[in-house]
Structure formats: C-alpha cells, structure tokens
Amino acid sequence: MSATAGDIPYLGHDVWVGPQSQWWVHQQVNLTRKAATAVWPPDPYLSLATTRAVTRSGDHLILEGVPSPVTGVQLRKRVALSSTRADTVEVEATARNIRSESIAWDLWFNTRVAAGTRVFVPVADAADIRLQPPTEAGTVAPIYRHQGGVFALRADVRQDGLIQRGKVLLQPSAGWMAGFAGDQVLVIRFAHQPLSAIHPEQGQVELYLDAPPRHPERGLLEMEVHAPYRQLAPGERMQANEQWTLLRYTGPDAQQAQHQFLCSKAQELQLTNACAPSSAAP
C-alpha cells in the first residue's frame, strides 16, 4: 500500500468520512501525511482493513470494521434485503467515535460504477451545481446537462485524446439519483438534507469522473452521497442509509428516453422531481 499509488478504479461500494480535507489532519499515525494536509488516500483502516461478519443470515449481513487511529471512528455496515421490494436492498453504515475527545465528520457513501453509466440527479437550479475541474495536463472537465430540473452526466467518446476528469458537487432537490448502464438502472435513494446540514467543502451528492477518451466505459464514475456533518462525543454514534433498487430497462440509450423512464417510476419509487415540469408520471 502506498500513498502515491493514485486512485485505482475498483468498482463497487465504499464508506468514507468527510470532509476530505481533514482525512489526515487529526492523527499521529503518519506525520508526513498530516504535515502535507493530504487529501489522499482515504483512511485505509476504513477501506482496506479486514472486517468481521457479526451477523450473516438469508436476508441480511452485518460487518464490523476495525477502530481507526487515523479518523478516530469504527464502522459497522448492514446490508439487508428489502421486506417490501424484491428488487431492493437497504445499506446502512454506523460510525462510532472511539476517541476520548470529540470528533467531527460526515458519513460518505461512494458507489463506483463504470464511466459509461449515465447518471441522473434532481437539481433545481444551476446555482446548486459546483464544478471542480481538473488541473492536470491532458484532461478536460466533465460535460453535463441540466434541463427541466434534472442533472445528467456521462462520459462519452472523445476524439481529442483528452481524459475526462473532475468532480461535480450538487445540492439535490430530492433524495435520489439513478444510473443507467445497458439494460439496467440502479436507483439510489437517501434522506434529502438541507444545504446547511452538509459540510461546505462537500455536496450532498457528488459525481467524480475519470474516463479515457476512446473507451470511457473503462473509466470510473463515483456516485457519492454525504450525510450531515456532525460532532460526536466520545462513544457517540451516527448513522446513514441508502436504498438501492435495480430495475430492468429496455429503452434506447438516450437521455430523453431514460429521463422519461424515471418519470414513469416516480410515483412507485417516490422519485420527487423526476418529471420535467410539463410531464407527469402516469
């Protein structure tokens, strides 16, 4: 393991804490990272250490991580089949302050998918979108569309040889986002939070893109959700959760058609603001 290894684009799901700027500030394990106010890598005790299966049954799994001397928390994760929908799982994370003094973090869910995924997020105004462009040579910022109260992002093929890289921080108008990949749609639902509850350096929803120009499907797109930023007393816990629903999609690979599909599911899945103002879910 190396702090200079870069962001290896493994797909899947991880849980971090935020804000990112504080990852290595409140620890004595690696003084070099602390002095650099490093923003990479994430806490390895949360992401890479072996977890213990506390409970394993036919409908749910509970995993317990190790106490982290880097961020001062211990994570417990629960993944359970929904009791009401066969196509849905519930994902929950709990962080406990293991230190003898107060700490302050948020819980940060990161679902990593292929960059060819088209992601939709309900966003009311352009002012609710903050773009963090790349600084490296040979890169270009993600290109997104925002129309009818819905934000859409996907890495498309580029002929100019530029890597599509950067992050978009969003204040959503409702607690969901959806990613289309082939004949599947992953809908992630979560508790919608006011802007004041989220650390100012983050967005409640963040999308990070890193995609090669000719084969963007080989790149990485992170579908991230931040829970409220909280101060925890010694031994205190905080919790966040998401619901993941996997749907079959047989329509064309086109933004308008996919948006309309989400609108058709708005009432069933409580996808507030999924429909354009002139549309209505059946």
Question: Which ranges hold each PLM region?
Answer:
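Surface-exposed acidic/polar loop and edge beta-strand patches at domain peripheries
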Residues: 1-90, 98-282
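Beta-strand-loop-alpha "switch" segments that mediate conformational coupling across diverse proteins
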Residues: 93
